A protein has these predicted regions:
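Bacterial N-terminal signal peptides that target proteins for export
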Residues: 1-8
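A generic secondary-structure micro-motif detector
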Residues: 5, 62, 91, 128, ...
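Active-site loop signature of alpha/beta-hydrolase-fold enzymes
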Residues: 58, 81, 88, 93, ...
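Alpha-helical cap/lid subdomain in secreted, periplasmic
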Residues: 97-228
Length: 228
């Protein structure tokens, strides 16, 4: 049977349209076409090193990449270690504030927890019994939320403005907590930096970028052996 030319043209157009219904659709790969398994992206399996502290950890007055936790992250990357550095510093944080927020920060498990708090307690002359209880509470929470996590306690010192006895007891507090809980201690986080005008900002408390580089070396000397 001979079809009219208009009908032939319509059928040809319909056939071509069906062949090209989605010209932008990607071509199927042989694996997809055959139903074979397709490789999925590998999830990030890096272990987390969490820095939990106040404005010194947060890097007040310097760029984020200049703060010592970021510098530790660079050292980790250079050493090709399977870890990532997380900065959970908060300016103005006291041990009481840290104790109240540590559970929220530990929603995901960590491999190493670096605890840098207490300086603001000491500068404000808060009771050392409270500081001790709060630091202990933070350590207890870490061990409950991330069993097996390595804990590093960063010791601090304060000037004797509030009396020699208070300053001495404040300094001893970190060693005592470290001994009681068998955690790794950095005796003084700001060794080589504290009290040096060239390495601190105008407030005399917060390190400059050069000061943070020294702090990072101090922390790395303690932290590196724990990363394996």
């Amino acid at each position: 049977m001979k079809l009219p030319l208009p009908l032939v043209a319509a059928l040809l157009a319909l056939g071509l349209g069906a062949c090209n219904s989605n010209p932008n659709a990607p071509e199927k790969t042989p694996a997809a076409a055959s139903g074979a398994p397709v490789a999925l992206p590998v999830p990030d399996t890096k272990k987390r090193v969490l820095f939990f502290g106040n404005s010194i950890t947060a890097g007040l007055g310097v760029e984020p990449e200049e703060a010592f936790p970021a510098l530790i992250g660079q050292k980790i990357d250079s050493a090709k270690l399977n870890y990532e550095a997380i900065n959970a510093g908060l300016s103005g944080e006291t041990t009481a504030g840290g104790r109240s927020r540590v559970g929220w920060v530990l929603r995901q498990p960590v491999a190493v927890f670096v605890l840098e708090l207490g300086g603001n307690d000491g500068l404000r002359g808060l009771p050392l019994t409270d500081t001790r209880q709060n630091l202990q509470g933070i350590i207890d929470t870490v061990r409950r939320r991330s069993p097996g996590a390595q804990i590093v306690l960063a010791g601090m010192q304060i000037p004797p403005n509030l009396g020699q006895a208070y300053a001495a007891d404040f300094k001893k507090l970190y060693q005592e907590i470290s001994d009681k809980n068998h955690v790794t201690l950095i005796p003084f986080l700001l060794v080589g930096v504290g009290g040096d005008p060239k390495l601190n900002q105008k407030d005399g408390i917060h390190p400059t970028p050069a000061g943070h580089r020294i702090v990072a070396r101090t922390v790395w000397g303690v932290l590196q052996p724990l990363l394996h």
